[in-house]
């Protein structure tokens, strides 16, 4: 990114500065393509996954489920496909969308039914994702979900799939997304993609999964009525979504923040909305349970000491809640 910050050239220009900027963009495109199992020509850089979903789904007639991200739900019939108590979609053919992994529960959709679009944002970098093996015509990924900069993402799209340009202008990104490319952001995206690919090859997330599972076991030992959402399904290795009786999610967020831990009640994209998780309600949980849920996310460098510290803070705070309830 530092090299990109020093360049003043437009990647569409033919002079030396422009060619240097273009080379950075194309190098990043190759790294992103390698991470997601796509051809470089199938990677279209955007301002993020929200824009990528709009480009892919605008003017389409698609079926999906209520556990999809809001940026996807805006363009689909989200009542068409039901999910079970683990958040797994019922198989369905036709023009469908699929969230590869849920941002709140981490539940992975293992079937290959999506014919139109896949939201791969949460999955990429944490579990293997291969666009070439997907049935979908398009998919979305985002840089900040793999440790890259915010405000840059990519649309993965088959060369055979026609889509109408939604950002009109100079025809950049092979005519699929106009506007001068964010060279600095794209450079960071490429570097993050290369690092994420190495982490997957080195299986660094295996230790994260073990720590996550150990944390959940300790939480259940402390509170046997604690619910871990999606624990019977395949999940991302870094995500834990759980609810404890009598302790609302937003209160937990505040208590953990005071203790030095950044957790969330629902998806971070919906932070500030103090209401029950739409995803958990779609999975069949009641309003009170869904309102008591928090999500704890871990990184590939999370340590046992981090988990011990979190468990100490959480159990101490919940002990006070139980004391007030007389439990």
Locations of regions flagged by a protein language model:
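Pyridoxal 5′-phosphate
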Residues: 1-327
